[in-house]
Each structure stands twice: as structure tokens, then as C-alpha cells.
Swiss-Prot record:
Assigned protein family: Belongs to the metallo-dependent hydrolases superfamily. TatD-type hydrolase family.
Xref: NCBIfam families: YchF/TatD family DNA exonuclease
Needed cofactors: a divalent metal cation
Cofactor note: Binds 2 divalent metal cations per subunit.
The name this protein goes by in its record: Uncharacterized metal-dependent hydrolase BU355
Record keywords, A-Z: Hydrolase, Metal-binding
Pfam families on file: TatD_DNase
Binding site for a divalent metal cation 2: 102, 138, 163
Gene3D superfamilies for this protein: Metal-dependent hydrolases (3.20.20.140)
GO molecular function list: DNA nuclease activity; metal ion binding
Record bears the keyword Hydrolase: yes
Annotated source species: Buchnera aphidicola subsp. Acyrthosiphon pisum (strain APS)
């Protein structure tokens, strides 16, 4: 079986615990059939850091972009969106950088930066279209504006994935209409995710990805503890039950979906 963690933050795992280093993390992942990883950047300095940390590992892919909660800080550093956009363009052409992001909108933690977030989100989409690379979208308490901007910026030209999806079926359908994929995280294993699971059951298998978002959102039975890519197996297992499909078949389909979207 071959599983791909389509969204993780390998640099943020807790490497201070006994026997916890990147080699141990990868070994545990391989033992759980997780064999490729997309480690996602959240700002420019973070991108440089993850590329430096993991450059010798050929199973790790990268994205380059600015998380919506980091937009204000990055604008202060780069002064203009144009300067930042040029930096993202440059870095996104580096080997093994297969996507832009994570970008998007987060109104849960920061509603006073809506305009900056929206401007950055639009610019990521425009760059992605120029570079012919997909985008990784973060959306929290902002479904309506997220869809609106994706539609207005013709994001079907670059496509992408809505990571750690928690939306309703109507939102899912609009994303699918744009050619986007929907990624399931450990949230689907939570007891209070019944409505989400009903939605996931309706989404075509050929448009689903799986992710840990580690070190966040640990799935059951590890909820409340630090997450890691090895736990993707439990997300895949739960999703296979939801979709009433053998887990090996699910692994094959989600791996194929990942390779199709990210052109690898």
C-alpha cells in the first residue's frame, strides 16, 4: 500500500522527544505505508527553512506561499505585494516545489486583515496560473469569500486543493466545479464531525486527497497528542470505512489523485 501525506509541516514536529528526529518520523511513516510527503510553507522564511532541513530526502515535496495569518507580517517585510509575488515566482521554480501555498482566508483568528488576506490570495492564484502549478487553499470561517475569489480569479486554470476540508456539500460542489480536489484530515475521525462525514461520503473518490496537517489535528485514537505523518494511516482507514472501499484501493486512488493534481 502507498499513501501520500498531501499536507504536513515537518519542520514543526516535536523533535525534542526521545528518538524523535526526521529519520525516525520518516521510518514510522514508511512502516505505516506513508511514503511521500508534501511539506507546506506558511511564509517565505519558512520555505527557506524547510528546503534547507529536508533537501536530502527525495520523498519530500514542497509548496511555497504565505498563510493568510502571515500576510500582514510578510507585507511589512517585502513592502509591496509585487515584491512578495516576485519572490514566490522565483522560489516556486525550484526543483520539487510542486504547488503554491498555503494561501487563502482565515477570518477565525483575524478578521481585521480581511482585505490584505484577499489581496494575497488573489495574487497567489494569478501566479499559480502563470506558472501552471496548483494552489493549496486554507479556508476558515470564510467559505463564501473563498469560493467567490476562486471563481473571480478563474482558479480552474490552475486548480488546487482545499486542505483540511470542513465545509458543507454546497461548498464542496462549487470546489469540484472549479476542478479542485478536497483533502480529508484527522477531523473526519472526530466524534462531532457527523455532518462533515455525510458530505465526504458524497464526494467522488477521484477528487479526494488525504492529509495529516501534522503536527496539528491528530486523528483518533491520537487526538490531543502531537500529530505526525505516520498517523495518515488512521485517516485513510477511517475514510475507507466512510466510502465503503478497501483501504488498499483507497490508497491507490488517493495516490493517483495526488500525482494527477501536482503533475508528478
Amino acid at each position: 500500500m502507498f499513501l501520500i501525506d498531501s499536507h504536513c509541516h515537518l519542520d514543526r514536529l516535536n523533535y525534542n522527544l526521545p528518538l524523535e528526529n526526521i529519520e525516525d518520523v520518516l521510518k514510522k511513516s514508511y512502516q505505516n505505508h506513508v511514503k511521500n510527503f508534501l511539506t507546506v510553507s506558511t511564509c517565505i522564511s519558512n520555505f527557506y527553512n524547510i528546503k534547507k532541513l529536508f533537501k536530502k530526502y527525495n520523498t519530500i515535496f514542497y509548496s511555497c506561499g504565505v498563510h493568510p495569518l502571515n500576510c500582514k507580517k510578510e507585507l511589512n517585510l517585502f513592502h509591496t505585494i509585487e515584491n512578495l509575488s516576485n519572490e514566490i515566482k522565483k522560489l516556486s521554480c525550484i526543483k520539487d516545489v510542486i504547488a503554491l501555498g498555503e494561501t487563502g482566508l482565515d477570518y477565525y483568528y483575524s478578521s481585521d486583515t480581511k482585505k490584505i488576506q484577499q489581496d494575497f490570495f488573489r495574487e497567489h492564484i494569478r501566479v499559480a496560473i502563470k506558472l501552471k502549478k496548483p494552489i493549496i487553499v486554507h479556508s476558515r470561517n470564510a467559505s463564501e469569500d473563498t469560493i467567490k475569489i476562486l471563481q473571480e480569479e478563474n482558479a480552474e486554470k490552475c486548480k488546487g486543493v482545499l486542505h483540511s476540508f470542513t465545509g458543507d456539500y454546497n461548498t464542496a460542489c462549487k470546489l469540484l466545479d472549479l476542478g479542485f480536489y478536497i483533502s480529508c484530515s484527522g477531523i473526519i475521525t472526530f466524534k462531532n464531525s457527523l455532518e462533515l462525514c455525510k458530505t465526504i461520503r458524497k464526494i467522488p473518490l477521484n477528487r479526494l486527497l488525504i492529509e495529516t496537517d501534522s503536527p496539528y489535528l491528530s486523528p483518533a485514537p491520537y487526538r490531543g497528542k502531537g500529530n505526525q505523518p505516520a498517523y495518515l494511516f488512521y485517516i485513510a482507514e477511517y475514510l475507507s470505512i466512510l466510502k465503503e472501499i478497501d483501504i488498499h484501493a483507497l490508497g491507490h486512488i488517493t495516490t493517483s489523485n495526488f500525482r494527477t493534481l501536482f503533475n508528478i
